Amino acid sequence: MQTRNTFSCIKKQITRSISVSLMLYIITRTSIASAYPIFAQQGFENPREATGRIVCANCHLANKPVDIEVPQAVLPDTVFEAVVRIPYDMQLKQVLSNGKKGGLNVGAVLILPEGFELAPPDRLSTEMKEKIGNLSFQSYRPNKKNILVVGPVPGKKYSEITFPILSPDPATKKDARFLKYPIYVGGNRGRGQIYPDGSKSNNTVYNATAAGIVSKIIRKEKGGYEITITDASDSRQVVDIIPPGPELLVSEGESIKFDQPLTSNPNVGGFGQGDAEIVLQDPLRVQGLLFFLASVILAQIFLVLKKKQFEKVQLAEMNF
């Protein structure tokens, strides 16, 4: 009887431990999933400034290319692809937050005209779903469905990102018009150099905050350095903290100037922006164009037939 009770207690403890572990796993996964904030969303109501500059450039300081491809024209209530290409050398490795080297991630922001939005899953073709893969798109703001963000995602797999877009229908959306519209895109590869609060990441160069002699360099246990700079005139000391990642360029006893680089610049990524144009085409206008072309072709045919008939009449009169 005692053995049975002991077994029952052990069973309850194991069940409880599994339940707690499962809860911790779910909580941890949730926090990890939400630990990739799109920094621009936190600090800016609109990602594109009045000057045309996309705010992602505030954190990603290096300038790199980005390309966007969209159809020249689309019909109302139609799903189409906006393909964003973020090219880079796949052999490159970036400095991670812990100072180690790893693959580059990519991200993009797509600014569509008002009324254009992410296409619902039930409107996507099988081919389009394959192109999208496991990408998860989200609106920049709940009230800004025309601005889409994605990332960070692995660059080796998603250096080309396909956005599924649904065009508006002016018949149901009064604000939509049959016009030519601009589309803006921003894309980054790799980590940024500056955080939104203005502090530096470990993916950038660190400069001396004072002039003097490098009197001491301490290598930290978890990586990084503490560099003590002593002013030769008054012996005042300044300590510069270097996080893990950048390579040190100075040594003890070296004389340095203010703002002189203490480390190399480990950044291999960068940000770029571009634009394209798309026409929301009126179906009646297309039908009118087709009708006009058909009329021209028919007129040409009748003209040729009339000419041949006239030639036959002339030939008959000559023979008569």
From Swiss-Prot:
Chain ranges passing through the membrane: 286-306
What's the domain of life for this entry?
A: Eukaryota
Q: What molecular function does GO assign, one term? A: iron ion binding
InterPro entries linked: Cyt-f_TM, Cyt_f, Cyt_f_lg_dom, Cyt_f_lg_dom_sf, Rudment_hybrid_motif
A GO cellular component annotation in the UniProt record: chloroplast thylakoid membrane
What is the residue range of the signal peptide feature?
1-35
Can you quote the record's cofactor note? Binds 1 heme group covalently.
Provide the primary localization. Answer: plastid
The residues the record assigns to binding heme are: 36, 56, 59-60
Keywords annotated in UniProt: Chloroplast, Electron transport, Heme, Iron, Membrane, Metal-binding, Photosynthesis, Plastid, Signal, Thylakoid, Transmembrane, Transmembrane helix, Transport
What does the function comment of this entry state?
Component of the cytochrome b6-f complex, which mediates electron transfer between photosystem II (PSII) and photosystem I (PSI), cyclic electron flow around PSI, and state transitions.
The entry's protein name is Cytochrome f
Which species does the entry assign this protein to? Ipomoea purpurea (Common morning glory)
